[in-house]
């Protein structure tokens, strides 16, 4: 469990500049909690944090579990992973995703999203609903649109 928490905190530092630190999990017969230190305050469980913070921390914990599994993955698929994130965290997450993938040793990421705010300048984009007048949909390398 220590390796997972350690990597999760390393990845969280990329996203939140060290503002949040996951503490050892509380696991017993009657409870499962993930305490998190944030802004000098100890949250007894991440469930008491904002939905955007929960989304980011849950995603980071998932990456940490994946990294510490016995199977290594060159390609990951992220389906609506940015859904619970607010605008600022969504934009920031897209910026940090390449660094997370580098740490994990992942070469490619297939990301499914309904949000146009992502900074995808370095991505190949497949659009299923293209609005030529919307500048948010005209960034990156559009390789196919409908």
State where each predicted segment sits.
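Walker B catalytic motif
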Residues: 73-81, 85-89
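Long, charged, glycine-rich C-terminal linkers/tails
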Residues: 17-37, 77
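Interfacial catalytic loop of ABC nucleotide-binding domains
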Residues: 41-45
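GG-anchored amphipathic helix commonly corresponding to the ABC/SMC/Rad50 NBD signature/C-loop
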Residues: 51-77, 96
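Conserved catalytic network of the ASCE P-loop NTPase/AAA+ motor domain
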Residues: 15, 49-51, 66-71, 99-105, ...
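Charged, surface-exposed helical/loop "interaction arms" that form contiguous linear patches used
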Residues: 1-24
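Flexible glycine-/small-residue-rich
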Residues: 24, 36-40, 51, 61, ...
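C-terminal lobe/lid and adjacent interdomain/linker elements of RecA-like ASCE P-loop ATPase modules
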Residues: 91-146
